[in-house]
Amino acid sequence: MLRARIARWLLVSAVFSAGVSRADCADVQKAPECLPRFYQVAPGVYRGGQPKDGGFELLKQRGVRTIINLRDEHDERERVEALGFHYVYLPMDARDEISAGTIQTFLDTVSDPARQPVFIHCQRGADRTGFMVGLYRIAKQGWSPEKAYDEARDIGMRWWYRGLKRQIFEFAEKAHPEGRGAAGK
């Protein structure tokens, strides 16, 4: 398992160190290089890491309407708004408690058909993005916290952010106090 993760990390590093030009991102086959950890969560909901050069343009071609930035950096607003996206800035630190207000704004935005399709990202598309997608899975898709956390971990959430794991389980308790979703869905 660890060897597979290391091999995957080396492969991803090699791809990114090779460099990708904006013209390459016009080719849909180059999506993994332009949009790290790009993945469809549900119809109208996508996740990934910080788009590389040309990545936002590729998202536009795919019909994405809203960009949700979970990074502390706020440097992409002008660029994504110029491309016609709706921009939602929800900065968070994976080491801190994520506020209920931030979580609710996220869930409201992702669930609003007028804002879909949405693309959610942080720097790596793993820790903060994995956390928020896990909450979406629990709240909107009825997933168990175990399944939501396992998916986040499998996509790259790092184990040392124990507060994120704890919050996923606490959120599930509040979202489904009767135990719905805990059956492993």
Which residue stretches match the model-derived regions?
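Cys-dependent protein tyrosine phosphatase-like superfamily
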Residues: 2, 15-119, 131-185
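Conserved lysine of the Walker
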Residues: 128
